[in-house]
Amino acid sequence: MRLSRYFLPVMKETPADAQIISHKLMLRAGMIRQTAAGIYAWLPLGLRVLRRIEKIIREEQARAGALELLMPTLQTADLWRESGRYDAYGPEMLRIKDRHNRELLYGPTNEEMITALIRDNLQSYRDLPRIFYHIQWKFRDEVRPRFGVMRGREFLMKDAYSFDIDETAGRHNYNRMFVAYLNSFSRLGLRAIPMQADTGPIGGDLSHEFIVLAPNGESDVFYHSNWEQPTRHIEADFDDPKALQSIVNDHISDYAATDEKRDPLREAQAGDKLRQSRGIEVGHIFFFGTKYSKPMGFTLPGPDGKPIPIQMGSYGIGISRLLGAIIEASHDDNGIIWPEAVAPYHVGLINLRIDDENCRAIADSLYQRLEAAGIDTLYDDRNERGGAKFATMDLIGLPWQVVIGPKGAEKGVVELKNRANGEKQTISVENAFNLLTAGHQQR
């Protein structure tokens, strides 16, 4: 994409109402613009990152055996009355009446909707186990929306729901999602620590939240220093309950807790390896058994023909929130540092002198070759000062920068910069192309 044809309204100054670094950088980098309190329009650069995050999450959900569907944003109030949550949920739920005076709501979550949908379309215990998920915009009328996409009123969520005939099978599906979440966050370049959590209004007796460490996090967290080790992708057989349980056990054996769930005994055992930081919740999973299936009459005939209430679980990832968490965990004084897996573009190509024939020829040729090789490239071909171009590329945080100037063009060389560590090297155009495409093939 040529930057001269792109829509990238970067800001030189930090908006006064932006309090945390992710909000500041997303505004300055032209990723979002606020349209109302806690509601944002996603501009092209921000939307590309959202789509990349969605892709990774979809792949890991599919690997764990989940099927994608899409439920409506509007739900009937009667569904929520079936579960008993309509009056209990509170004013953060947006309630609506249509022209026929029928009560609707803009769903803040989908337990009731998915329970009714699957209840009406499964016939036998042989149809289980099942996991369904969808990715959908949601709305919660927060009293005080703040921190940009981290605490907005409208947000993008991945919700998954599991259905099983007994508790043993239900906990197996819970572990499937536990491991799928670990792999999703690892691929996104995040170290997400699973911590035992309260079930809150969702309900149930088993729950973990996944916390990313960040200086500007929303809550205090306490953890063993082993959690500071690099993440790795977990090769798992999702159909093997014992193997999955072993993986889960490995990931809850080292101490980690939010302020509400602290355990003084385990903290004492951790000793000088205990760490304290701030954290951001990026995912939350629940096993709530028959909390929704019983009041909503969701049973299936078991092997003996008798009706059995279905065991359920719920699994959420805040996708738009994740984007903010990635920035909180990966930035410097100059701007964002995107992990390669989610970067909106892989390469930022800078032509320092668009009026120089040599520069233009080399830059145009390299841009065309990179695009043909499948390397997403943002080509700064604007008639701007070099300093402004460097500042823009650092701000938006693309993993690699290729700089072409008049002196280098005469020699057939370019400057290649790694945004993450700042290392620069002057190499031939061909070597730069080979390095960038080789890295792409390895991914």
UniProtKB/Swiss-Prot annotation:
InterPro entries for the chain: aa-tRNA-synt_IIb (IPR002314), aa-tRNA-synth_II (IPR006195), aa-tRNA-synth_II/BPL/LPL (IPR045864), Anticodon-bd (IPR004154), Anticodon-bd_dom_sf (IPR036621), Pro-tRNA-ligase_IIa (IPR002316), Pro-tRNA-synth_IIa_bac-type (IPR004500), Pro-tRNA_synthetase (IPR050062)
Recorded superkingdom: Bacteria
SUPFAM superfamilies in UniProt: Class II aaRS ABD-related, Class II aaRS and biotin synthetases
Catalysed reactions listed for this entry: tRNA(Pro) + L-proline + ATP = L-prolyl-tRNA(Pro) + AMP + diphosphate
PROSITE patterns recorded: AA_TRNA_LIGASE_II
GO molecular function annotation: ATP binding; proline-tRNA ligase activity
Gene Ontology cellular component list: cytosol
Record localization: Cytoplasm
Keywords assigned by UniProt, alphabetized: Aminoacyl-tRNA synthetase, ATP-binding, Cytoplasm, Ligase, Nucleotide-binding, Protein biosynthesis
Family: Belongs to the class-II aminoacyl-tRNA synthetase family. ProS type 2 subfamily.
Record NCBIfam families: PRK12325.1, proS_fam_II
Known partners and oligomeric status: Homodimer.
Name this protein carries in UniProt: Proline--tRNA ligase
Record gene name: proS
